[in-house]
Curated annotation (Swiss-Prot):
One of its GO terms (molecular function) is histone deacetylase binding. Residues 1-109 are annotated as: Disordered. This is Twist-related protein 1. GO terms for biological process: aortic valve morphogenesis; cardiac neural crest cell development involved in outflow tract morphogenesis; cardiac neural crest cell migration involved in outflow tract morphogenesis; cell proliferation involved in heart valve development; cellular response to hypoxia; cranial suture morphogenesis; embryonic camera-type eye formation; embryonic cranial skeleton morphogenesis. Residues 165-195 are annotated as: Sufficient for transactivation activity. Subset of mesodermal cells.
Length: 206
């Protein structure tokens, strides 16, 4: 009887049953692996959305994981570039303030130079007028004289010539030595006469 059992071939039904029993055992590890993969992918997606810079990392780095060294370097570079831009903007603002402060200073300097030039011109004109007024007091003039500066200088030159001629003559030495006031009056009168004669002779000659 034992020989019949051992030697009897396995029926197809029994083989199918054994295969069907082994298939669930194989499917169970495969399904377990798939579940583990789904859990890992869900954890990665959750970490990428909740992590700091996840959106920027997804947009910039593409498939890089959040918090990776490459993403950290890129974040540092972008932060450094922003800081440099801010520093450049600050430098530009400083240059604008310096140029804006320089233009009013130059305008004030020009105004100061103009004021100083006007003051010097007024002082020069005032001193010149005072000198001509003193010269008119020295030169004997007629009541009808309204001399300009050039005419005053010409009359002064003629008066110097007249005084030279008086000093060369010997007739008025004894008469003018008596009184200086009388001498001055006589000189003024003589100069007026000499001047009128000279003007008459000049007009007659022309």
């Amino acid at each position: 009887m034992m020989q019949d059992v051992s030697s009897s071939p396995v029926s197809p039904a029994d083989d199918s049953l054994s295969n069907s029993e082994e298939e669930p055992d194989r499917q169970q590890p495969a399904s377990g692996k798939r579940g583990a993969r789904k859990r890992r992918s869900s954890r990665r997606s959750a970490g990428g959305s909740a992590g700091p810079g996840g959106a920027t990392g997804g947009g910039i780095g593409g498939g890089d994981e959040p918090g990776s060294p490459a993403q950290g370097k890129r974040g540092k570079k972008s932060a450094g570039g922003g800081g440099g831009g801010g520093a450049g903007g600050g430098g530009g603002g400083g240059g604008g303030s310096s140029s804006g402060g320089g233009s009013p200073q130059s305008y004030e300097e020009l105004q100061t130079q103009r004021v100083m030039a006007n003051v010097r011109e007024r002082q020069r004109t005032q001193s010149l007028n005072e000198a001509f007024a003193a010269l008119r007091k020295i030169i004997p003039t007629l009541p009808s004289d309204k001399l300009s500066k050039i005419q005053t200088l010409k009359l002064a030159a003629r008066y110097i010539d007249f005084l030279y001629q008086v000093l060369q003559s010997d007739e008025l030495d004894s008469k003018m030595a008596s009184c200086s006031y009388v001498a001055h009056e006589r000189l003024s009168y003589a100069f007026s006469v000499w001047r009128m004669e000279g003007a008459w002779s000049m007009s007659a000659s022309h």
